[in-house]
Amino acid sequence: MTHITLLSANDFQVSDWSGGKTKQLYLSPPTGHYGKREFDYRLSTATVELAESQFSDLSGFHRILMSLDQTLHLHNASRQKETVLAPFTPYFFEGSDSITSRGTCTDFNLIYSDHYQGQMLAISDREELSQDEAIQFIYALSDLMVTGTGLPSLNLETGQLLIVEKEAQETELQIMFSSNQPKCAPLAIWAGLTHIPTK
């Protein structure tokens, strides 16, 4: 059984952070609290409006970050590593890492607890995806159509979020992305979470 949820702008929570504005797309559980760090996973997009900003301390969580438009220069003081992050490239790091970001952009974030393993990809027109993650997110960067095995054909508008939750981990989800206005830039961001069984 596959459960599908489609969320739009009215479902998202917008708030300020030290470097700009953040839009919370999804928080699990819905009764959780991001500020108190009481949640399993969180998907968000944010504007980075300062030339230099410091990432929030999210100790106990793992993070994936992707710029949706501009190149970022990241300094990870915890690992003494510099990264030049091109748009639509995922950057994996620990929530406890001390990171300074240089450059302004709009970014896409997935934060998740130790109970999950996360992935993130930028999706182009006519691309096919075959993934077995139990929880999958598709964030539309432009109007597009999503079709797939076990899925109805869905038209997503720019800024909408599609959440696909599968009960059977064994079955891979085959998804096809297409747009009436083909372009070079990615159509969507895909993110997936696999639940890690407790030992």
Feature locations, PLM:
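Jelly-roll (double-stranded beta-helix
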Residues: 1-199
